[in-house]
């Protein structure tokens, strides 16, 4: 993995591997981004994907929360987006201010799909900027905290590629899996193949831990999740370590899966090959701990909306959460149940992190 500085804080790596820790490690999904004033200063008037593709700027944005919350955050996550995989597969993606992602030419029929299936993806070439940003960030961090790489889950990426953006009804994605199940599997397989290579090359570039965001997992029924999501998540968990060995990386790289809303699948996710399963806030942690039976590390799961509450409420909710996950000295990573919001107060986030340290160290 190159001549990178040795980690000074490996708390999250140890927790992910199931080792005992002094306190639960803390990081937050979307910890780098729009709620930080320094993000807006650096991004300036650049387009979102233009920002991601500038390695120097992406690296700076990645490090901003680590710098602001020095000693409180136990990992950095590279500033990027799950939709870079569809881009690498030849699809055009725009990020519309205030509206979110938009695909001008979504996949709506078998002919559209064939174009994507026939497209030869060169991951190293298409996503070269991402690997440069990771390497640059890993060097700049100087071992202060480990660096996350990530990608979107295959089903979630298929949703965006077929819907043309976010959705409430999931009309087109559901149409695909119900009208063209075989073609849907072909698309999911191609996305999976690209995801495996992308994640593996992120590790080569310097990522020390990986997360797969299956953000739309909860939009599938349990039966459809078992057919259109879980097998591809399992493939990723199984194939990435093998690909890393082919690339000369023998050390264990912890992998996290976050299938938001997929409450019915927790037992299966705990034996899917991932080291960590991340939970959204709909879960009662005590129930999740029972179902898990100590097989994997659990991550989560504070409702991000708690950040709009008083300090007393934040303290109470953090205490409840850490205690419900067993105290945090083993098999637990503190996080939100989803990402930060643009409207959050950075000082409130700091208080949350301080309370996680204070309560988790007891």
Curated annotation (Swiss-Prot):
InterPro entries: UROD/MetE-like_sf, Uroporphyrinogen_deCO2ase_HemE, Uroporphyrinogen_deCOase. Pathway: Porphyrin-containing compound metabolism; protoporphyrin-IX biosynthesis; coproporphyrinogen-III from 5-aminolevulinate: step 4/4. GO terms for biological process: heme biosynthetic process; protoporphyrinogen IX biosynthetic process. The keyword Secreted does not apply. It is found in: Nucleus; Cytoplasm. Coproporphyrinogen III binds at residues 30, 32, 34, 81, 160, 215, 338. Keywords: Cytoplasm, Decarboxylase, Heme biosynthesis, Isopeptide bond, Lyase, Nucleus, Porphyrin biosynthesis, Ubl conjugation. Catalyzes the sequential decarboxylation of four acetate groups of uroporphyrinogen-III (octacarboxyporphyrin) to yield coproporphyrinogen-III (tetracarboxyporphyrin) with the formation of intermediate hepta-, hexa- and penta-carboxylate porphyrinogens in the heme biosynthesis pathway. Acts on a number of porphyrinogens, but only coproporphyrinogen III can ultimately be converted to heme. Present with 9220 molecules/cell in log phase SD medium. Belongs to the uroporphyrinogen decarboxylase family. This is Uroporphyrinogen decarboxylase. The lineage of its organism: Eukaryota, Fungi, Dikarya, Ascomycota, Saccharomycotina.
């Amino acid at each position: 993995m190159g001549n990178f500085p040795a980690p000074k804080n490996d708390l999250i790596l140890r927790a992910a591997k199931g080792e005992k820790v002094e306190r639960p490690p803390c990081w937050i999904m979307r910890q780098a981004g729009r709620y930080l004033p320094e993000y807006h200063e650096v991004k300036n008037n650049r387009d979102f994907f233009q920002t991601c593709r500038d390695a120097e700027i992406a690296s700076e944005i990645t490090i901003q929360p680590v710098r602001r919350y020095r000693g409180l955050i136990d990992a950095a996550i590279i500033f990027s987006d799950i939709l870079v995989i569809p881009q690498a597969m030849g699809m055009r993606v725009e990020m519309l201010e205030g509206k979110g992602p938009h695909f001008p030419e979504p996949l709506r029929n078998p002919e559209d799909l064939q174009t994507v299936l026939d497209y030869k993806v060169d991951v190293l070439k298409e996503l070269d900027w991402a690997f440069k940003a990771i390497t640059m960030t890993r060097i700049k961090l100087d071992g202060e905290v480990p660096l996350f790489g990530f990608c979107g889950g295959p089903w979630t990426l298929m949703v965006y590629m077929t819907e043309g953006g976010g959705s409430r009804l999931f009309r087109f994605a559901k149409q695909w899996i119900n009208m063209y199940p075989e073609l849907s599997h072909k698309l999911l397989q191609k996305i999976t193949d690209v995801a495996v290579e992308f994640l593996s090359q992120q590790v080569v570039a310097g990522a020390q831990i990986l997360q797969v965001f299956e953000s739309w997992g909860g939009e599938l029924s349990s039966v459809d999740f078992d057919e259109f999501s879980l097998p591809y998540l399992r493939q990723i968990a199984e194939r990435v370590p093998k690909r890393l060995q082919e690339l000369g990386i023998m050390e264990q790289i912890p992998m996290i899966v976050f299938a938001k809303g997929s409450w019915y699948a927790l037992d299966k996710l705990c034996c899917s090959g991932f080291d960590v399963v991340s939970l959204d806030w709909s879960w009662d942690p005590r129930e999740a701990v029972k179902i898990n039976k100590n097989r994997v590390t659990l991550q989560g799961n504070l409702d991000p909306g708690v950040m709009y509450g008083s300090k007393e409420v934040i303290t109470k909710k953090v205490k409840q959460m850490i205690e419900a996950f067993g105290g945090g000295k083993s098999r637990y990573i503190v996080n939100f149940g989803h990402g930060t919001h643009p409207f959050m107060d950075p000082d409130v986030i700091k208080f949350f992190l301080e309370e996680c340290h204070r309560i988790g160290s007891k």
